[in-house]
């Protein structure tokens, strides 16, 4: 496992000042270390969505997509986390949502944007998305990795850094938290092309507009829920207002997804680009993939963007 704290963008590739633990830098970045990666976006008003298959987005029913992920999973432990709990109460804990599953050989991690989800989960079956949450668009990223390349304790430590609400827990081991300043953005390398960034709620910062852009000379386009005080426009970041996905055009006000894209990278995660989110924990995964980035950029028809 590789942990880093200082992101540096070199050219169009993300590089990191890293300190390696558990395994060497060579082995944790080897070419056979990619693991499983699934991306999906739900469209507003229903369960219709798209999923990334064979280098293109294809139509999918998002509840069936989620069902297939866990149908054949045989985990020995799991946990769910969400700032909006299934019982309905809203909290000010970490603004992050996900499901972590594991067994003796593998770790699976779903990062999503759906409040109060899942209502039920037993490791291999989960409740469908509730009707109230089908109104808006949502984002999903599922990754799976061998425990040869990744430590469960390191992943749990990364999640705990964001201080979320845990629920539906089973067989969760004790975890020693990070012993460092909360002003660090914690970086966990999941695979050679995927990293996870985690912000503590004690670090009051604009995650998308500042932390995601650090050392970054390229334009980011961000899509996130905006209900509250927004930031003034600034160089290097454009907020998306209209999307066209699978022939459906809708405004970002109908979309609860959280993602951002450059020409070569895609971030999928937790936080919205609003000032109120500075005091919330959260983060997300950055994926280095030209084809995936191009597909996300194709949704931005209203901006007239074309990849060079």
List each model region and its residues:
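PLD/PLD-like phosphodiesterase catalytic module centered on the HKD motif
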Residues: 1-308
